[in-house]
């Protein structure tokens, strides 16, 4: 299978227009990606720190910023037919882009190990399974979760069409039961916060929940049939989908002191629903996660063998889960998550400023081994994010983009207006 075969999802080239998808398909895949268990814990922190009305305002503002960021990258993905790692060749250089490949790839394989282990451990705990059986489940899940990613976009799409509506029904059921338990909306509005967070920290928490995922959502928005599809699907996935996960976590923390919807469903007496939610929630994110790894790996190795890289990544992630390294990886993965957003800032500045909104065809572009303004801007953005007291990921994006525009302008490195691509 060649890298231009539709079944291989064009890992090293633009997605042609005949392979593009509509809004329902793209939005459903992104919702499957953003329906992520870990996001609920951020909501749990908000639920005990604000009144219900203030909490809703934080969730709306934080997720709107996240959705707009994803939509900006999604628009570029539609226009170019490229994903973030391929865009990285333009802003970081042919060799320099391997830095972003490593960062994005390592983050995803680590989260794959975490998700695989989490599914096995939770089921093992619920059914009181011995350690050997839990390890066996890790192997089973590690291979099972990658099956839809192995198929490609079509596999992710099919699972999302099944998982997303099912999860929505379970979430609505859980929220209805929780609302009744707390005394209706009047009860929610009367809840007194037991903790405290300032708005800056709260927005940082919400925006940072999935900003690394938003940076890599171009893997699917590049399949968009139009700019409208790319932008709306991004907003649906990250403003609505991620926002719902944060809200569910907050609901659980307010009513049950437990942000994880799986645990909440168990407390509500819906044991089978809880197990279904666990598997659907993790699987619909895991397959996207390993797909992200495969895309980054293909660009790193300059290979079109996406399916082979997918399987290799699943094996590595499963081994990390079996070795218990997923527990040790989480702090480093969160750390890496803070250095991913500046990549998006450089990409947007490079596309809109340097390339004036139109990349040349990747196969025809003469790119340097290292694009030092891009690499330097990324470094500035990362340092700014680490030292910022306010919405660190957003500061990292803005600092990286602004630095790139200034340096590129000073060096006179803007391109002439590029001709439109025929995708």
Model-based region annotation:
Residues 20, 344-423:
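C-terminal membrane-solvent junction of multi-pass transporters and transport-like membrane proteins
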Residues 1-53, 197-203, 222-232, 410-423:
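Membrane-interface "cap" regions at the ends of multi-pass membrane proteins
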Residues 149, 165-192, 202, 207-210, ...:
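Hydrophobic alpha-helical segments and their helix-loop junctions in multi-pass secondary transporters
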Residues 29-33, 101-105, 116, 127-151, ...:
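Transmembrane alpha-helical segments of multi-pass small-molecule transport proteins
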Residues 136-141, 145-178, 193, 231-238, ...:
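Membrane-interface loop-to-helix entry segments
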Residues 45-75, 96-98, 238-239:
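Extracellular loop-to-transmembrane helix junctions
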Residues 45, 49, 74-75, 118-128, ...:
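Membrane-water interface regions at transmembrane-helix termini and the short interhelical loops
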Residues 97-131, 283-299:
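Hydrophobic transmembrane alpha-helices that form the core helical bundles
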